[in-house]
Amino acid sequence: MKKIVLVITILLMSVSVSAQKKKKNAKVSMDVDGVCMMCKSRIEKAALNCKGVKYAQWNVKTHELKLIVDERKTTVKTIQQSIANVGHDTKDVKAPKEAYDSLHGCCKYRDLEIQEDHKKEKQ
C-alpha cells in the first residue's frame, strides 16, 4: 500500500513540474496603442530588444502585436514595460508621460485629432 501511495505521489509531482515548464517558442499576442508606421517600427524594435523575443510584428489597423518568445528568458510584463518605455500603452502597462510626450507629433495616439487624421489616410 505504501508503494502505491509513493508511486502516485511521484507521478503527481512530475505532472505538476511539467505543467510549469516554460516554453522556448511561446506564441504571445497583445494589444499595443499606436497609429502609424513609425509607431510600428518603434513598437517592434522595443519588443525585439527584450532578451528572449525572437519575432515581433505589430498590425497598424488592429493594434495587435504578435510575438514569439522564449519564456525562459523573459516575461510578458517585461516586454510590456519595454514598449511602454518607448511611449506606447498596452492593456496592463501605460507609457510614462515623458515617454509619450517624446513621441513624434503624428504618433500621439491618445489625441483624437491624430487618430482621425490617420483613419482618413488609410481610406
Regions found by a protein language model. Name each.
Residues 100-122:
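Short, low-order "capping/linker" segments at domain edges
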Residues 22-34:
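Short glycine-/aliphatic-rich beta-strand segments at the starts of folded cytosolic domains
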Residues 33-47, 105-109:
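Short, thiol/selenol-centered motifs that function as redox-active sites or metal-ligating centers
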Residues 65-66, 96, 100-102:
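Short secondary-structure boundary/hinge segments and terminal tails
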Residues 13, 30-33, 100-101:
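Processing junctions and N-termini across compartments
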Residues 40-82:
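N-terminal, post-signal-peptide region of Sec/Tat-exported proteins
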Residues 87-99:
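Conserved short beta-strand edge segments in small beta-sheet-based binding/regulatory domains
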Residues 1-24:
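Bacterial Sec-dependent N-terminal signal peptides
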